């Protein structure tokens, strides 16, 4: 009824929708606690069949009324939320500009019907915030813009791992890197034909580790301007890029 009436949802209860039907979720109380990342069973995640589009602001899962303007998330907030949802064809809006560690960890991992990624406006990142976010999204053809200039350890690790339909990588404007920040970011993106410019001059340990591993359609790599290196910074960066 347009959000006028809300009822409590019991976990693991199936909701049946016909074509054109909609269902909305919002937090019963504002959530400030963090997930226990050591226990997968404590995560909340969707299990769906058919073809499902997720619309509007994902922050309604954390906030009762102010989700439209609330700009930050807690650690592990949306980890695994849509993992292996092969029926998901559209992602919800992710407006948050202040991220917490692991907040989007594995969020869309294995969403094989997802063709377009949501916008990611954050400019300051946290540890593992985007790690594995779109891993295995084999239908994803375009990556979102990634405007962040302040990054963190493993923030993009495995982000597009196995995205076999991705042809072009987004710009990566950060000039100061963090440990493992781009680790395996495009591993297995074998249709990727264009690599981003990498302007960083301050490197970190394993920062580019296996970044383009298996990108066999990549024919050109841009210059790497850093003059002072870090331990293992370029380790296996272009391994198995057979067309390079």
Task: Kindly give the residue locations of the regions a language model identified.
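Negatively charged
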Residues: 1-244
């Amino acid at each position: 009824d347009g959000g006028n009436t809300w009822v409590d949802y019991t976990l693991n209860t199936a909701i049946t929708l016909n074509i054109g039907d909609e269902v909305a979720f919002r937090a019963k109380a504002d959530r400030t606690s963090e997930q226990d990342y050591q226990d997968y069973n404590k995560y909340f995640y969707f299990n769906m069949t058919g073809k499902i589009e997720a619309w509007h602001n994902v922050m309604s899962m954390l906030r009762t009324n102010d989700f439209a303007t609330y700009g930050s998330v807690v650690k592990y907030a949306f980890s695994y939320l849509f993992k292996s949802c092969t029926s998901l064809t559209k992602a919800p809006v992710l407006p948050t500009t202040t991220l917490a560690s692991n907040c989007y960890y594995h969020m869309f991992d294995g969403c094989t019907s997802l063709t377009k990624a949501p916008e990611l406006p954050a400019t300051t990142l946290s540890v593992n915030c985007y790690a594995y976010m779109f891993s295995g999204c084999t239908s994803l053809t375009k990556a979102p813009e990634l405007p962040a200039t302040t990054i963190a350890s493993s923030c993009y690790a495995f982000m597009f791992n196995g995205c076999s339909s991705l042809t072009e990588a987004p710009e990566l404007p950060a000039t100061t890197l963090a440990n493992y920040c781009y680790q395996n970011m495009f591993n297995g993106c074998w249709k990727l034909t264009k690599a981003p410019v990498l302007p960083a001059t301050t490197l970190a340990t394993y920062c580019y580790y296996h970044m383009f591993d298996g990108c066999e359609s990549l024919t050109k790599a841009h210059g790497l301007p850093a003059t002072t290196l870090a331990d293992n910074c370029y380790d296996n960066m272009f391994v198995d890029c057979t067309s390079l």
